[in-house]
Amino acid sequence: MMKKTILACVFLQLVLGTVFAQTVDSTHIKNMHAYYKKHFSDPTDPIVLTASDTLLDMAIRCNDTVMSKIALGAKLDYYYYGQGENRTDSVIAGVNRLKRFARSVGNAELYYWAWAARLVNYYIIQGEYNIALLEAEKMLQEAKKEGKQESIAECYYALANVYAAKGLMKKSQEFMLKEIDIFENTDVVRYNISCQYSDAAKIYIDLGEEEKAPELLKKALKAVKSPYHAVTANLVYVSLYLAQGDTVAARQALEKCRQMYADEPSLKRHIHYLYDVEIDYDWKVGNYQKALNVLDERETELKRKNNLATLMQLRKTKADILWDMNRKEEAAGLYRDFLLEQKKEKERNEEVATG
């Protein structure tokens, strides 16, 4: 959650319209939080498109910067998480709106968060990796000019995500650890640092260095500030136990994660992370058909959202599973598709770089 500041009238006039200074009634604050809890647990629900306007009005009356940010970001998240037509234009417009708001209230953290966590990540989801990288590098240049460590940390977060999407995991981890270093050695607050600990641990596991993961996962759990942080760390524990050959512990950890998703509605938007770990678990323990069934469900969802980048990675996983099932001809066809898509992506990236 962004640090809370009180909006001065001049900022409200510039950003949100003319508002008269007033004493905030505690009833208004309670009503605002109740309204938020009622309508904003699921960012993919169309109700947020109208509810966000109402929440913004409430936030203005309460002089609440945090709720103003949430209200402005609600429409952005609706499109970011895969809803509505003209998504790209809507995401860009929403990011720019949030960045303008952040500059007007002097919130550099929000400014770079909108740029990194929404615009850069959106391009990653769309498979536009070079555009994402260009945006992340522009961010870093701007942040270094300003000289604020918290802004630079947000840029490291963005660069880590881009390199992970490009399959350059060691490079991705390098930027994760840079962000972690800023968090551990300065007074910079990183709300989502728990996820960076978890993600860095997962890369160690994937690189066959799982002995380095437990310390990072302990730090991840210690830094938890939301259900999403907690479930992210626990999902990585599933991968750790699988790497250690402890399938019993892996199954227990997976069941714990399933229960966490069932108990917390706000995790619905992140359900794909659970599915990915379920696929990996079933694959590793030999439940190949079950893994393929979950994978097919994921493919259907990704096609609906037109998430082509993740779809191709998933098909590579499907090919790996089919190969282990000795269905080598089917696997070979998927491998060819994957390599062809990689070639096309390289050509697209070269065009972007030339442009």
Task: List the predicted regions and their residue ranges.
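Bacterial Sec-dependent N-terminal signal peptides
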Residues: 1-36, 159
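Hydrophobic positions within repeat-based interaction scaffolds
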Residues: 22-34, 38, 45-49, 89, ...
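Residue signature of alpha-solenoid helical repeat architecture, marking inter-repeat boundaries
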Residues: 26, 66, 70, 109-111, ...
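Structural register within alpha-helical repeat arrays
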Residues: 35, 75, 118-119, 152, ...
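Short coil/turn connectors between adjacent alpha-helices in alpha-solenoid helical repeat scaffolds
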Residues: 37-47, 79-91, 120-132, 163-171, ...
